[in-house]
């Protein structure tokens, strides 16, 4: 922004002050020699120029002359245009960022950086960076299949091994490629396989229920994760089934604990909710159903408990409404009738409450061609964020003996093929609040509309809460337009020439103009090189760079590219669930139901 400065006029004014004084003094010398005005005095001035000298004089006439000389440039300045000018930026000031500007965000220790492109990195830990480059570490990565999202972003950042990781693993290959490297570095590797549903760690939401408040959290996570649409008219049915769902989950929560000692009598799972739903219908209105008897018995042992209250609210529904609610919830839980799914959630080996204190890498294998079971990953993330947030808060507030801030490990959630996961409850709020808990999220999508279709009105909030965007490619017009606008406008100068010819003579003219144009038009955004990417960092100009590569990383020889690489390919076996033991212990609820049916 340019305003015409006054200081050049002040300097000229000072010179004018001296010059006017000096000429006045010289003129006074001529008056003494030639008393008459006219050509004689002018001749004397020209002939005796050697007597002229610069100086400052303090007689009144010289001072007046000097003030006149000083005032003339000031008058010129006062009469000039006072508007602000931005020369070269009249239509926009956007430009490509320089490497020097990007280097400010780096940590001096290479391993403590996130890798965005061949030359751009950002320190993962703000306390190691200058205050003016401390940003949140949430990242949006956009690229088409084949643009190298995994090869140029996910793998290089896993190879940094500078934090804990929770990574979605489309196709399930990633853990094989980096698992051995991570284990050698001391990481505990967890695998939640939603592709094969076997040879996997187990995840049981009931394991993380510490109070009756968790009944609501888990119920809402399941409802949100299995929701098929956002139709507003469904809200009544959603609220109605939540009452029943809270009642059933609450029943399992209270019934599985000794009311006096709090000792866990058995570990329920979501498959037991499906068992309860199968036996909820009333065949004879005069005879209480087995489920009704179970709730009454629970209330006798634990009066006025939360599950019983929710059950009584559900009992207010009658006839078709009641049957519809049961049918909706039964449909939602029918997925747990598959033995492989039931086995996957029968116990818990994920150990979520250690993810931010113990060196851990978690891989969630999700199919990219069928999302029938992917809702389990959204439930896992919803519960995981709750568990880890509370654990981090307790550590930061000094409530966990033996732990302090220095024991809190940063967790990077890397959501490859984010649209396949399903909707995570309260995700926008989570994204905006986890920074202070040493967590960050990397969202990898193919186009903006994927996020918009999944999170509706929240997608802009999610975008705005990511300080860094890495663009690798797209064919989506809205995405092109978004990043073209984000790149900004620049000022350019255009020159046009016109010529005219006639029989006797010709003429030509040249016209120069200032115009504005996007730094990158939408089609230019789409046409970046196959090996290129655009790095957008909050409050900075866009940086155009080559993509990062696994082959440029110092640990390139520690990862595997195929099963033929026996030295680095990671093979694993996860302990199978003891079905017989589960039936004797955790399936105690099913035995109770059978006894009631016989009675």
Regions found by a protein language model. Name each.
Residues 1-147, 151-154, 493, 501, ...:
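Basic- and hydrophobic-enriched, low-structure N-terminal and domain-boundary segments
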Residues 21, 135-439, 454, 523-544, ...:
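P-loop NTPase motor domains
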Residues 46-51, 60-114, 212-223, 272, ...:
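Short alpha-helical interface patches
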Residues 98-105, 119-131, 151-152, 321-327, ...:
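A broad, low-specificity signal for short, low-complexity segments enriched in glycine/proline
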Residues 181-182, 206-208, 457-461, 485-490, ...:
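Short secondary-structure boundary/capping segments
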Residues 366, 370, 417, 445, ...:
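Short loop or secondary-structure boundary microenvironments that flank
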Residues 431-433, 440-534:
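Conserved ATP-driven motor cores of ASCE-family P-loop NTPases powering translocation/secretion/packaging/pilus
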């Amino acid at each position: 922004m340019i305003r015409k400065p006054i200081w050049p006029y002040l300097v000229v004014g000072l010179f004018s002050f001296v010059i006017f004084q000096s000429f006045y003094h010289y003129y006074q010398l001529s008056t003494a020699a030639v008393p008459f005005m006219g050509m004689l005095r002018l001749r004397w001035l020209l002939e005796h120029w050697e007597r002229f000298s610069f100086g400052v004089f303090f007689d009144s006439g010289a001072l007046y002359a000097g003030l006149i000389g000083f005032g003339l440039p000031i008058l010129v300045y006062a009469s000039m245009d006072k508007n602000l000018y931005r020369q070269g930026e009249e239509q926009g000031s956007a430009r490509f960022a320089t490497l020097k500007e990007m280097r400010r965000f780096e940590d001096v220790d290479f391993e403590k950086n996130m890798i965005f492109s061949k030359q751009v990195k950002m320190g993962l830990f703000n306390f190691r960076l200058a205050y003016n480059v401390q940003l949140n570490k949430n990242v949006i990565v956009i690229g088409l299949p084949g643009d190298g999202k995994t090869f140029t972003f996910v793998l290089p950042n896993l190879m940094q091994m500078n934090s804990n990781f929770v990574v979605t693993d489309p196709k399930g290959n990633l853990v094989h490629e980096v698992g051995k490297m991570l284990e050698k570095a001391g990481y505990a590797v967890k695998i939640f396989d939603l592709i094969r549903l076997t040879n996997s760690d187990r995840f049981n939401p009931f394991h993380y229920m510490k109070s009756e408040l968790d009944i609501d959290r888990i119920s809402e996570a399941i409802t949100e994760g299995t929701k098929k649409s956002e139709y507003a008219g469904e809200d009544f049915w959603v609220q109605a089934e939540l009452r029943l769902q809270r009642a059933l989950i609450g029943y399992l929560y209270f019934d599985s604990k000794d009311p006096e000692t709090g000792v866990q009598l058995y570990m329920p799972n979501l498959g037991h909710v499906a068992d309860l739903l199968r036996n909820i219908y009333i065949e004879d209105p005069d005879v209480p159903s087995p489920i009704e008897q179970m709730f009454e018995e629970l209330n006798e042992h634990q009066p006025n408990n939360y599950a019983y209250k929710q059950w009584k609210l559900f009992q207010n529904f009658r006839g078709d409404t009641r049957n519809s609610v049961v049918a909706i919830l039964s449909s939602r839980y029918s997925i747990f009738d598959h033995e492989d799914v039931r086995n996957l959630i029968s116990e818990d080996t994920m150990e979520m409450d250690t993810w931010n204190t113990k060196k851990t890498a978690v891989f969630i294998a999700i199919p990219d061609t069928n999302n029938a079971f992917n809702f389990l990953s959204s439930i896992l993330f919803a519960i995981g964020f709750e568990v880890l947030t509370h654990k981090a808060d307790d550590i930061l507030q000094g409530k966990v003996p033996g732990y302090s801030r220095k024991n809190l490990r940063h967790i990077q959630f890397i959501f490859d093929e984010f649209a396949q996961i399903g909707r995570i409850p309260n995700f926008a709020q989570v994204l905006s609040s986890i920074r202070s808990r040493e967590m960050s999220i990397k969202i990898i999508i193919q186009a903006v509309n994927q996020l918009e279709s999944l999170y509706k009105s929240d997608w802009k909030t999610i975008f705005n809460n990511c300080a860094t965007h890495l663009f690798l490619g797209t064919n989506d017009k809205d995405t092109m337009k978004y990043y073209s606008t984000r790149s900004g406008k620049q000022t350019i100068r255009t020159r046009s020439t016109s010529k005219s010819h006639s029989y006797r003579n010709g003429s030509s003219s040249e016209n120069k103009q200032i115009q504005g144009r996007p730094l990158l038009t939408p089609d230019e955004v789409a046409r970046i090189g196959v090996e290129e990417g655009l790095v957008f960092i909050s409050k900075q100009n866009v940086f155009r760079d080559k993509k990062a590569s696994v082959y440029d990383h110092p640990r390139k020889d520690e990862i595997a590219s195929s099963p033929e690489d026996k030295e680095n390919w990671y093979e694993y076996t996860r302990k199978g669930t003891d079905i017989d033991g589960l039936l004797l212990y955790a399936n105690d609820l099913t035995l109770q139901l059978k006894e009631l049916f016989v009675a």
